């Protein structure tokens, strides 16, 4: 009886280990057609993007997942811990909120940066970047944080007086409801008047991603439609 129980115990242990390994095993490219239908990427682009994902995910730790440092190095050419913009983009990519990116998260979120992504998606994503507190509107302090961070990362030094003046003008134009905050509708109107606000929302190389890994793309298992 004891031997039987011990055998069951060992079997359970093996099963638990298998389950644990399965849970930790990152998901790869399971169905490029699904991602192609649900993003702006073609099937070939999804497959090429997966090759890019594998390179990025092995830059620091070769685990098939992208951590924040790998993400910043790949997309922003920096691993600065204080990069607020990069932090915000990573947090919005990380829909599972576990500090790492699987391929599907990476592909779906990166889709908004494609040159062919709908303008409304870019506007919505950029709004979320500035909505640091995730309240559904942008406050003055949030704008200041992003402006200060952007200036610091670009090596520009402006006095606090000049920065406050920039924010004053921004709210004077954007806050048409005069309630001290910028909601989604006001943000959209502001961006439409000043498209340059979205210049960071487009990564041109995504349009040419299939030429980055031509040998892989030529062997696509599914034809683009």
UniProtKB/Swiss-Prot annotation:
Keyword Repeat tagged: yes
Expressed in which tissues: Expressed in roots, shoots, culms and young spikelets.
SMART domains recorded: EFh
Swiss-Prot/TrEMBL keywords: Repeat
EF-hand domain span: 45-80, 81-116, 118-153, 162-197
Leader sequence residues: none
Listed SUPFAM superfamilies: EF-hand
Up-regulation conditions: By salt and cold stresses, and abscisic acid (ABA).
InterPro entries noted in UniProt: CNBL1-10, EF-hand-dom_pair, EF_hand_dom
Site positions (Involved in dimerization): 154
GO biological process: calcium-mediated signaling
One Pfam family hit: EF-hand_8
Gene Ontology molecular function: any one: kinase binding
The UniProt record lists the keyword Repeat: yes
Subunit (UniProt): Homodimer. May interact with CIPK31.
Family per similarity comment: Belongs to the calcineurin regulatory subunit family.
Function: Acts as a calcium sensor. CBL proteins interact with CIPK serine-threonine protein kinases. Binding of a CBL protein to the regulatory NAF domain of a CIPK protein lead to the activation of the kinase in a calcium-dependent manner.
PANTHER family for this protein: CALCINEURIN B (PTHR23056), CALCINEURIN B-LIKE PROTEIN 3 (PTHR23056:SF138)
Official protein name in the record: Calcineurin B-like protein 3
Organism of this sequence: Oryza sativa subsp. japonica
């Amino acid at each position: 009886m004891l031997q039987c129980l011990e055998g069951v115990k060992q079997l359970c242990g093996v099963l638990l280990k298998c389950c644990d390994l399965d849970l930790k095993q990152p998901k790869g490219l399971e169905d490029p057609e699904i991602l192609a239908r649900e993003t702006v990427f073609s099937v070939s682009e999804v497959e090429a993007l997966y090759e890019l994902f594998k390179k990025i995910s092995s830059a620091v730790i070769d685990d098939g997942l992208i951590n924040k440092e790998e993400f910043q190095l790949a997309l922003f050419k920096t691993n600065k811990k204080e990069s607020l913009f990069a932090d915000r983009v990573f947090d919005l990519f990380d829909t599972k909120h576990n500090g790492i990116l699987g391929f599907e998260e990476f592909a779906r979120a990166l889709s908004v940066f494609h040159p062919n992504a709908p303008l409304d998606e870019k506007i919505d994503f950029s709004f979320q970047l500035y909505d640091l507190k995730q309240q559904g509107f942008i406050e003055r302090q949030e704008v200041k944080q992003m402006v200060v961070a952007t200036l610091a990362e670009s090596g520009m030094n402006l006095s606090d007086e000049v920065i406050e003046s920039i924010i004053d003008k921004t709210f004077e134009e954007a806050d048409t409801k005069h309630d001290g905050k910028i909601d989604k509708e006001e943000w959209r109107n502001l961006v439409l008047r000043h498209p340059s606000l979205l210049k960071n929302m487009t990564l041109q190389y995504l349009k040419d991603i299939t030429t980055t890994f031509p040998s892989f793309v030529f062997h696509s298992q599914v034809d683009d439609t």
